[in-house]
Amino acid sequence: VVRLPRSGALHVRRELPAHFSLRRSAQLTYAIENRSPRTLRAGLVEAPLRTLDLGEEELVTLLPARSEVDASLAALPVARGSDTFTRIYVWYESALGLVRRRFVIDAPQAFRVYPDLSAVERYGSLHVRNRLVEAGLRRMRLRGIGSEFESVRDYTSGDAFRAIDWKATARRGKLMVVQREVERSQDVMLLLDCGRLMTARIGAQRKLDYAVTAGLSLASIASLASDRVGVVAFARRILVARAPRSTAASVRALADVLCDVEPHFEESDYARAFAYLRSHLHRRSLIAFFTDVIDPVAQSAVLAELGTLAKRHAVLCIFMNDAVVSGALARTPHSVDESFGLSVALGLSAERHTAARTLQRSGVIVLDVPAERLSIAAVDEYLRIKSRALL
């Protein structure tokens, strides 16, 4: 007769990574201790989770007598937000596999899946670092065509004609330009549309997921420039509201707040959101508005408000276009279905261009890029706005 030790002879401890990032593979580590005098073969599987895809395979390992073995399981975060591990289903058997015993471990463990900022971190270490360091951020300054005089230097190719200091040029006999310091400690407000239009998926992620990631990416770079960053997320009502604040801790707080923001299957109340901004933003600010206004009803509501808002603030309206639509526009149709798809794509494209032109005529800066490039494009546009003193 083959006898197995009691379930108490097997002890399992789960260890989580420091944090989970959306769509970035992570490893769950398990310390599995065999307290029995026999070699055992064991396996475990986690209870299903909303935010993590753990695959369909069990974690299986061989446990020598009175030993502890570390094993890992791949996890792919598929949704943002808070979640909790609940139970671990464990089995173990003799080395020959003749007898198997099963038991369940209650192991509640809370965790959160954050937006993936790895792209902007890589970008920040290269492009942004170059852009900002060249602009003087080594001395914690952003140089450009701001309003504060800093110095006079030799003219170099690419300098604006209006930056030439003609008096200094006459004195020194060569072209000289005024170097001005771009203003710091300015306000940046992220405005996130969390209504019906942002529930649609582009690839594996929802539009709001892309918007949240891009917003936090912009906030991270703005903190390098010592700008204050706040956020308003809204659907039919205001979901999240944080006044602009400075320091890196504020960016971490924004990440915590936006981690759990979800899109709502309802029409967004744009008038309410813009009214909130008008009553709470008392100084000129950059408003980075993440939305996807493509239907005529939503467009009219937004356009009625944005023109007025743009008279007092710098408004950046950020759309994300779908690669499927772009692909349909680029292909020559060879069937009725493809022709129908092209017709739909042309209609969507025309609506987007109409909305963009109308917004631009109202003084709004419009950014319309593929969702996969949203974070980098938003950061680039922020840097352009700062360097040209548009804020």
Regions found by a protein language model. Name each.
Residues 234-237, 275, 375:
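A glycine-rich phosphate-binding loop feature that marks nucleotide/adenosyl-phosphate handling sites
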Residues 163-164, 258-262, 287-291, 340-341:
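Short, basic, glycine/proline-bearing loop/turn elements
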Residues 1-4, 29, 46, 122-124, ...:
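Von Willebrand factor type A / integrin I
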Residues 225, 261, 283-284, 312, ...:
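Structured helix-beta-strand junction loops
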Residues 1-249, 284-289, 297-300, 304-308, ...:
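An amphipathic, basic-hydrophobic helix/alpha-beta surface used to engage anionic
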Residues 242-256, 374-375:
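Short, electropositive alpha-helical surface patch
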Residues 294:
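Catalytic metal-binding/acid-base residues of hydrolase active sites
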Residues 249-286:
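Von Willebrand factor
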